[in-house]
């Protein structure tokens, strides 16, 4: 499972870092 330069937040969305 690859993550795209971001962090998973409890809401199930990804925020760019």
Curated annotation (Swiss-Prot):
The keyword rRNA-binding applies. Keywords: Ribonucleoprotein, Ribosomal protein, RNA-binding, rRNA-binding, tRNA-binding. GO terms for cellular component: ribonucleoprotein complex; ribosome. One of its GO terms (molecular function) is rRNA binding. Belongs to the universal ribosomal protein uS13 family. Part of the 30S ribosomal subunit. Forms a loose heterodimer with protein S19. Forms two bridges to the 50S subunit in the 70S ribosome. Located at the top of the head of the 30S subunit, it contacts several helices of the 16S rRNA. In the 70S ribosome it contacts the 23S rRNA (bridge B1a) and protein L5 of the 50S subunit (bridge B1b), connecting the 2 subunits; these bridges are implicated in subunit movement. Contacts the tRNAs in the A and P-sites. This is Small ribosomal subunit protein uS13. The gene is rpsM.
């Amino acid at each position: 499972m690859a993550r795209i330069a971001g962090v998973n937040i409890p809401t199930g969305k990804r925020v760019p870092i």
